[in-house]
């Protein structure tokens, strides 16, 4: 071992510049490999943080060749689809835009991203609940917080029944916390947001407002081709001009 070290030291002193360049080259190679593999892991595991993720699908529509594929859908499309097939275990509709809102909690102001949808729109993703129940979203003026958001607002996850205000308290827009769910991985479409239900009648029967993203959980991934046909049938029936 001493001989190896002595030879290395001798070579390093004799070929100083070349040795430095070799070390720098190896360092850059290892750093590049680490960065690339980190990105590969991020992409490979994208959206795999959900329970039985392979059963979850997002609806995308291509109305005509000129418009291309899009993920925005009207509310009635998803509701008709849910009742059209026994292979669909649940459907979740969320607003296509998640704003960063200000929240007042015990006199302190925080910023957090808000996701709104209809009913228990987390049912499709089956979050691991730390406290409370995801079904709390079926109650008006009741929200779910992620684990990290609960700790940010209150310093703890034991927050069931606590009140937060969307905006400032003076705005009188109070919401009760009905549950805390475990954080999703960063490489997920549904993130660690304040989950908030919309009013039940919003856009009900309205085919003109394409403002929602629709996710569904199937009994089996093999049912996807049949569901695609159902989507097309419902779409053609309600938009024969396209």
Language-model region placement:
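Generic structural signal for small/hydrophobic residues in well-ordered secondary structure
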Residues: 12, 22, 40-43, 59, ...
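Short acidic/polar micro-motifs at solvent-exposed secondary-structure junctions
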Residues: 61-70, 79, 92-120, 126, ...
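Structural preference for long, well-ordered alpha-helical segments in enzyme cores
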Residues: 8, 27, 39, 77, ...
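Membrane-proximal extracellular/periplasmic loop immediately following the first transmembrane helix
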Residues: 36-101, 202-203, 209-217, 228-229
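Generic alpha-helical secondary structure signal
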Residues: 3-7, 52-54, 116-120, 124
